[in-house]
Regions:
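Core catalytic lobe of class I
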Residues: 1-316
Length: 316
């Protein structure tokens, strides 16, 4: 199987041609529902109902599950959509701030069982559908942005986050927690030095106290040896990562740091990362920069050209 390649095809058709259990990790962000018209007959995101949109994505990711190794992980970036009037409203696709230019279809679709102005709940509808299809739903990571697109709404808070779902094919899967660990807070280190325990004011002689979160070995005479105080902690599930500008013609690119974090945790060095909605190639570039291989699938030939210019690689 070729790697470091960009495949110009529909995601489902291209995945069907890949061998079983051949890739280590998937990092992807499919087109969001009813927010942009890419002008392609087979595009995902322009379905008449949210249910049809969910069904199409589940079919794509069902095929992805076959292609993933048993220890593979799937990192899915998705955002929500508001139910509208069926006309072109004022809501902007968070991945496509300039995506309204030249639109030919309504961008705010009506949805069955939803009232006008309802938040449809696309991320969780998709997550539950994938879980029902056999995926292990392991984490809902909040991607928080300090520089979100401004919104003109006056009757709700402006949105500043998207979801990243971590899913796995099996109960046991590759996850390198150390690769994305984050520094402990200075106040936490200070508490360790003072001998304070989690949930207690002091570490010494607290009735019923056992080990202080597994680090009692570091304590000497009621205090902690600096050399043994932990400096890192497990990555939390709120990731503060700002969007970054991209000079190419594809406005849906998510930040490289986002893709890099997922790849570091979910794919071993030398492994293969796949993105069935490759766009301008952010996932592929991140994989290449981190000494992993990539397979990109993209239906839009113009985006394939952007990705090839950005990261190199073979196109088919």
């Amino acid at each position: 199987m070729k790697t470091d390649v960009i495949i110009n095809r529909d995601a489902l058709c291209a995945l069907r041609e890949l061998p079983d259990e051949s890739v280590h990790c998937c990092v992807t962000s499919p087109p969001y529902y009813a927010l942009r018209d890419y002008g392609l007959d087979a595009q995902i995101g322009r379905e008449d109902t949210p249910e049809q949109y969910i069904d199409r994505l589940v079919a794509v990711f069902h095929e992805l599950k076959r292609v993933l190794r048993p220890d593979g992980t799937f990192w899915l970036n998705i955002a929500d959509t508001y139910c509208g009037t069926g006309s072109k409203g004022g809501y902007t696709d968070p991945k496509n701030p300039k995506g309204r230019n030249g639109q030919s279809l309504s961008l705010n679709r009506r949805a069955p069982n939803c009232k006008q102005k309802d938040l449809i709940g696309i991320p969780w509808l998709l997550a539950f559908a994938l879980r029902a299809d056999g995926w292990y739903l392991r984490s809902d990571i909040i991607w928080q942005k300090e520089n979100p697109m401004p919104e003109s709404c006056k009757d709700r808070p402006s949105r500043c986050y998207e979801h990243i779902f971590l899913l796995a094919k099996s109960k046991q899967y590759f996850y390198d927690a150390a690769a994305i660990a984050e520094p402990i807070a200075p106040t936490t280190a200070a508490r360790y030095r003072q001998g304070r325990a989690a949930g207690h004011k002091y570490a010494e002689e607290v009735p019923g106290q056992g080990k202080v979160q597994g680090i009692n070995k570091a304590r000497k005479g009621g205090y902690y040896d600096d050399a043994l105080i932990p400096t890192m902690r497990n990555r939390r599930d709120i990731w503060l990562i700002n969007t970054v500008p991209y000079k190419g013609g594809h406005f849906a690119a998510f930040p490289p740091k986002l893709a890099e974090t997922c790849i570091l945790a979910g794919c071993p060095k030398g492994g293969i990362v796949i993105d069935p909605f490759f766009g301008s190639g952010t996932t592929g570039k991140a994989a290449k920069d981190l000494d992993r291989h990539y397979i990109g699938i993209e239906i839009n030939i113009e985006y394939c050209a952007l990705a090839r210019a950005r990261i190199g690689g073979e196109s088919t």
